[in-house]
Amino acid sequence: MSLAARAGRALGGRRAFISEAAASRAATLLDAAPDRPDVFARVCARRLEAASPADRKALEAALSELGNDAPVVERAIASGAPLDAVAILAAAWDSLDPDAKALVRDPLSRRDPGPVTWSRVTATQVNQTTCGAATMAMMLMMGDPLVALWVASGRRGGPYLPPEVFEADVRGGAIHTVADRWDSLQLAIHDRVTRHGLGLVPWPQAYGTPPWRVNNLTRFAGLRFRGVLVDDARADEVAALAAHARAALADGIPVPLYASGDSARGLDSVVPRHVVLLVGVDGDAFLAYEPSSGALHRLDLGALGGTPAAALGNWNRVAWAVLPKVRDR
């Protein structure tokens, strides 16, 4: 059991995510997923319904015009971007080169184990403290094509800049290539999550990303998120985590996980140490984006606690997960 989970149990007992009601709801959502529009489609539909007739007509035309790439527009609408920025993205789509289109279409670039690469750039974390920022940046690009567009090409949706891109621009420095923009986005997110990490007091950047900041600063399809402590030595908690993760992924929502180690490696190893992102299901296991390698790895939650796992950045425990709040799904 991780020290964090032990402390959480002492303070709060059993957590809500492993309750029978929560597990049942996750199972119901997973069963319904094949016949239910995903989170992007649902949020997009709500925004279109609320739009003016003229805006709705323009956006429906953009969705139709992009054909098989219509999900890019759908995700942009669901991101909360101004509708004119979405229209600019749609109008510019045909002028993008194939590499830029591929990155915007699918920032992961694959759905099997292996490196995540864009134009010969591997999507690794920029330094040893930005695993959380890299994970948040990857999730952000999966949910917001306008962020992915900027990383891919430096282009913007007209005068609109997603807040994370604005902060990356404000940081300054040489931002000329895909690698430059990917690194700058991570650093901007790292600045953001540590700025008020302890209320009014900054969190020391050398300590990485505090888990509670991933909860409240993750921006994805207008959802809100909650952090949950995980005791991966308990089979019921691992099963509950897997059920919630499968339900979220079936809805198009990635799941950040904090990895840790055993107390035998020292007290500093048992607190959350590294952040990865569950991005898909692979049979009985999951696919995780691991930022130190910049690759997707297979992760079997049922095998935690043994040999260090590449999917966890060579840690062997899971201590914390970030899940979408039920009422917003």
Task: Tell where the protein language model's regions lie, with residue ranges.
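Active-site nucleophile-adjacent alpha helix/oxyanion-hole segment immediately C-terminal to the catalytic cysteine
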Residues: 6-42, 46, 90-197
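Stable alpha-helical elements in mature extracytoplasmic
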Residues: 85, 127, 132-136, 210-214, ...
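N-terminal secretory targeting signals
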Residues: 1-2
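Eukaryotic low-complexity, mixed-charge intrinsically disordered interaction/regulatory segments enriched
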Residues: 23-24, 29-77
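Short, surface-exposed acidic
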Residues: 70-74, 147-152, 160-163, 225-230
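Conserved active-site-adjacent core of cysteine acyl-enzyme catalytic domains
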Residues: 15, 20-24, 28-31, 88-96, ...
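Non-catalytic propeptide/linker segments at domain boundaries
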Residues: 56-113
